[in-house]
């Protein structure tokens, strides 16, 4: 059931992406307050919800995105935003974790990495993880043939988890927090059914796209 103060537009934008993100972070990775969480692709539908869910759990959130989306990641609650198109993006993330570690009095590194990018950024994510940390994956938008340096897995006791969709109860939990105003859908734009081709073109190019695109029937 959609909470009374959640619009149909927001519910439509949230249905799959909110569920996927909630299951990744809460159901699979089981995030806890104070952890350092890396959200890859924070400008995507799942990434935008991932940022907010991690902040809901009082985690320190580092989001990656293309340059034009960094400010919006910060607006959603990310504590830091890093341009993942840079070759050395992981070095910037590592430097941030070192500063956070000083404040928290713990070892530097990422506790949970939230990934749906896949091949191009896979191994660099592994280098950023703490001992016993978790990388949870729900997709592979840049390719599925990721090469894994197993030294980063067995020497660090790394947990690599797969995740897809989620349960009805998890969706209800996410929608509850939307109803409380703690999580919101990032809706980039709305198109009519007659504009579907235009919407698909925007989705495929990804230029300036942040969050979800909605298709609405006339009069809805």
PLM feature spans:
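Glycine-rich cofactor phosphate-binding loops and adjacent beta1-alpha1 units
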Residues: 62-65, 72-159
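Anion (oxyanion) recognition and catalysis
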Residues: 55, 154, 179
């Amino acid at each position: 059931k959609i909470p009374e103060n959640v619009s149909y537009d927001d519910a439509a934008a949230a249905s799959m992406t909110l569920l996927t993100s909630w299951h990744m972070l809460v159901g699979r990775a089981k995030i806890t307050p104070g952890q350092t969480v890396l959200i890859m692709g924070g400008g995507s539908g799942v990434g935008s919800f991932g940022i907010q869910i991690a902040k809901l759990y009082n985690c320190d959130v580092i989001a990656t995105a293309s340059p034009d989306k960094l400010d919006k990641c910060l607006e959603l609650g990310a504590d830091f935003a890093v341009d993942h198109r840079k070759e050395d993006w992981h070095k910037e993330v590592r430097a941030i974790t070192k500063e956070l570690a000083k404040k928290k009095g713990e070892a530097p590194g990422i506790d949970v990495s939230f990934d749906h990018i896949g091949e191009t950024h896979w191994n660099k994510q592994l280098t950023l993880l703490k001992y016993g940390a978790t990388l949870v994956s729900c997709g592979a938008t840049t390719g599925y043939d990721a090469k894994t340096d197993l030294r980063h897995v067995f020497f660090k006791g790394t947990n690599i988890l797969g995740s897809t969709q989620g349960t009805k109860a998890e969706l209800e939990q996410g929608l509850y927090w939307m109803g409380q105003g703690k999580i919101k859908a990032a809706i980039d734009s709305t198109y009519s059914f007659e504009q579907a081709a235009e919407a698909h073109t925007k989705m495929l190019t990804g230029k300036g796209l942040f969050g979800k695109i909605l298709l609405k029937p006339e009069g809805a």
